[in-house]
Amino acid sequence: DLVTAELKDSVHPRQRAAMAMAKSDDLINWKLLPATSQPDQGFAETEVFQYEVVDGVPILLFCTAGPNISDERQAEGELGGVYSLPVREDLEDINFEHATLFPRKNIYASRLIQDVDGGWNLIAFINYVDGKFVGELCDPIPVTADPILGLVPKA
């Protein structure tokens, strides 16, 4: 399983987020493995991880809220949401600096699902609309993966 981690040796306190893996043979006793990413990659927190191979591209999906992104990302207009990045299949050397924000910016806590025809769709909770919390699931969004951009809406 993929787990949220925080690395204390970060130069920037708001960029301590990391990802690690935990393994279990019995789902009762777990062994935490070393982090697969480094600190200082733009996020204070990353959560709701999912790894899938989407249309041949290994993708890591996660989300974070606006207060948990770096000043640099905030200066570029990012407010948090669903992020993705192409990764190695062994999930080693994750670099969150390459993460891109999914174009639909009002969703959070997403999951990739396949439809009956094998196409990929993103479902997520609708976060805020016009300043009001919604908290409902959005309709499935057809997606594909780009080896540079990560997860993108299907054209």
Model-assigned labels for residue ranges:
Residues 1-155:
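Carbohydrate-active catalytic/glycan-binding domains of CAZyme proteins
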